[in-house]
UniProtKB/Swiss-Prot annotation:
<dbReference type="Pfam" id="PF00239">
    <property type="entry name" value="Resolvase"/>
</dbReference>
<dbReference type="InterPro" id="IPR009057">
    <property type="entry name" value="Homeodomain-like_sf"/>
</dbReference>
<protein>
    <recommendedName>
        <fullName>DNA-invertase</fullName>
    </recommendedName>
</protein>
<dbReference type="GO" id="GO:0000150">
    <property type="term" value="F:DNA strand exchange activity"/>
</dbReference>
<feature type="active site" description="O-(5'-phospho-DNA)-serine intermediate">
    <location>
        <position position="9"/>
    </location>
</feature>
<keyword id="KW-1160">Virus entry into host cell</keyword>
<comment type="similarity">
    <text>Belongs to the site-specific recombinase resolvase family.</text>
</comment>
<keyword id="KW-0238">DNA-binding</keyword>
<keyword id="KW-0233">DNA recombination</keyword>
<dbReference type="GO" id="GO:0098678">
    <property type="term" value="P:viral tropism switching"/>
</dbReference>
<keyword id="KW-0229">DNA integration</keyword>
<keyword id="KW-0230">DNA invertase</keyword>
<dbReference type="GO" id="GO:0015074">
    <property type="term" value="P:DNA integration"/>
</dbReference>
<dbReference type="InterPro" id="IPR050639">
    <property type="entry name" value="SSR_resolvase"/>
</dbReference>
<dbReference type="GO" id="GO:0046718">
    <property type="term" value="P:symbiont entry into host cell"/>
</dbReference>
<dbReference type="Pfam" id="PF02796">
    <property type="entry name" value="HTH_7"/>
</dbReference>
<feature type="DNA-binding region" description="H-T-H motif">
    <location>
        <begin position="161"/>
        <end position="180"/>
    </location>
</feature>
Length: 186
């Protein structure tokens, strides 16, 4: 059975073009979502994935209508293949029921994996470069060491943590973490 899936990014957009193409391709059922492809929550896609069974073919008008990213798309099509379900994209001329279509998807999978590895590599290189320049990542500390020492001196003088917290606009729990209760009598 050919089962279609259409998606538009907003409620203002029309699914008619996609629906017509899927109907012309012979889709018996068509599911739809009106949401950004970046959103993981797509009820129409969830329904179609539950509905598909061995021997069915999921048909989309264009690849970007199905996947949020190339990696997501490859993973999704692999899951379909594992369940005995084919995938077809009309405008991209992809059909995983054919040897050429399966080959194309293997190539896409390899490219997606390479892309992921390159991102990891660039991220590591960027972090290493930042460390070499003395940056350690994360946000800047709210207080310099001198300010912490001032708080410590007040606590040592017996000023209650709550009062120090108000003076320095810091949570009492932060003071307990930085200066454990066993350190002071307050």
């Amino acid at each position: 059975m050919l089962i279609g899936y259409v998606r538009v990014s907003t409620n203002e957009q029309n699914t008619a073009l996609q629906r017509n193409a899927l109907e012309s391709a012979g889709c018996e059922l068509i599911f739809e979502d009106k949401a950004s492809g970046k959103k993981a929550e797509r009820p129409g896609l969830k329904k179609v994935l539950r509905m598909l069974s061995r021997g069915d073919t999921l048909v989309v008008w264009k690849l970007d209508r199905l996947g949020r990213s190339m990696r997501h798309l490859v993973v999704l099509v692999e899951e379909l293949r594992d369940r005995g379900i084919n995938f077809r994209s009309l405008t991209d001329s992809i059909d995983t029921s054919t040897p050429m279509g399966r080959f194309f998807f293997h190539v896409m999978g390899a490219l997606a994996e390479m892309e992921r590895e390159l991102i990891v590599e660039r991220t590591r290189a960027g972090l290493d470069a930042a460390r070499a320049e003395g940056r350690i990542g994360g946000r800047r500390p709210k207080y310099q060491e001198e300010t912490w020492q001032q708080m410590r001196r007040l606590l040592e003088k017996g000023i209650p943590r709550k009062q120090v917290a108000i003076i320095y606009d810091v949570a009492v729990s932060t003071l307990y973490k930085k200066f454990p209760a066993s350190s002071f009598q307050s």
